[in-house]
Amino acid sequence: MTSLPGSFLLSRSRLRLCHVRNTLAALALLGGALAGLHPTAARADETAICYNCPPEWADWAAQIAAIRQATGIRVPFDNKNSGQAIAQLMAERKSPVADVVYLGISSAFQASRMGLLQSYKPAHWDDIPTAQKDPQGQWFAIHSGTIGFMVNKDALDGKPVPRSWADLLKPEYKGMIAYLDPTSAFVGYAGAVAVNQALGGSFDDFQPALDWFARLQANQPIVPKQTAYARVLSGEIPILLDYDFDAYRAKYQDHANVEFVIPREGTIAVPYVMGLVKGAPDAANGRKVLDFVLSDAGQKLWAAAYLRPVRPVPLTKEMSARFLPASDYARARPVDYQRLADRQQAFGEAYLKTRH
C-alpha cells in the first residue's frame, strides 16, 4: 500500500475532528425540534439499511443519530457512492438487502429505469418541487447543492476573487483553476452543464461549454478525477469548480479563508435524492427513515451541513446567514434533470474529443 504524505494525514485528522464537533453542534442545535418527536418502541435490532449514507458526506452522521433518537431505528453507515450503490442493488435484486438508497439525480433516473426502486410518497411530498421528484414516488429530492467557485482567497496572491465564467479565462488566473474530470466525476459534469447553460447552450448543443473548456486550457487548469477539497484548503488549488456546501464547510467548519461565488452568468443547482428499494426487507422502517429526512428536524440538519433543504423549512438566523443571499441563488437556473441524466455520456464523449 502506498504511504500517504504526513500533511495529508494531518489534514484528514483535522477534517474528522471538525466533523465530530460539527455533528455534536448540529444535534445540540436541533434538540428542541427532536424533543417534540416521540420515538417508537423499537427493538435493539430494528434497522433500516441505507446504501450510500457515508458519515462524512452531508453530515449523514448527525442525520442518522437523529433518526435513531426520533424513531428508534438504527441506520448503519455506508460508504458506497451512487454508482456503487446501484451496482450493489442490481447484484442483489433477487434478494434485496437495502431498504433505502441515497443517490445523485442522474443515478436516480438510472435506478428507476432499471426497476430497482418502488413507489412511496413520504410525508411532506407536496412540499417538494415537481421537477425534483418522480411522479410515481420512486425517488424524491431531499436537498441540493449549487455549482460555483470555491475560492481560497489566501492562495490568490492578491488577485481579485473571480466573479464570472469569463473571469476564469483571464491569464492572471493561470495555474490556479481546477475542475473535476467531467468524464468520471458527476460534479465535473454538473460544472460543465452549468457553464454550458450559462453561456447559451442546451442539452442538444454543448458547443458553448466545449469552447469554454478549450479556451480555459491556456490557463493550464488542474483536472483531478476525485475530490480536491483538501487541496483547496492547503492552497494548492486556489479556485475549484464545486458545490456550495463544500465551500461553506471549508469556511465555517474548517475555518479557511474561503469564499463561494455564484457566477454572474448563472449556474445550476443539483438535487440529491432518496428512494425506497424494491423488495426492501424492512420497508416499514425504510418509510420511516424517508419521512424523517423530509421532516422539519431532518431538513434543518441538512441546512446545518450547508446543503439547501428541498422544503422551505424555517431556519435560524445563524443558519440562514451562512448561505449567500437569495438574490445570488436566483442565478441558479432550473434544468431538465431527465435530460441531464440522458446526455451525460454524450457530453463525456464530446469533451474527450476536444482533449485530443
What residues fall within each predicted segment?
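A bilobed periplasmic-binding-protein/Venus flytrap-type ligand-binding module shared by bacterial periplasmic
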Residues: 148-155, 193-198, 270-283, 301-302
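Early extracytoplasmic/lumenal segment of secretory-pathway proteins
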Residues: 44-110
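Short beta-strand->loop
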Residues: 117-126, 139-140, 166-169, 238-239, ...
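Mature extracytoplasmic/periplasmic domains
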Residues: 277-334
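Extracellular/periplasmic bilobal clamshell ligand-binding domains
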Residues: 319-356
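A ligand-binding cleft/hinge motif common to bilobed small-molecule-binding domains
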Residues: 106-110, 233, 238-257
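Extracytoplasmic ligand-binding site segments that recognize negatively charged/polar headgroups
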Residues: 53-61, 97-236
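Periplasmic-binding protein-like
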Residues: 127-130, 145, 210-215, 221-222, ...
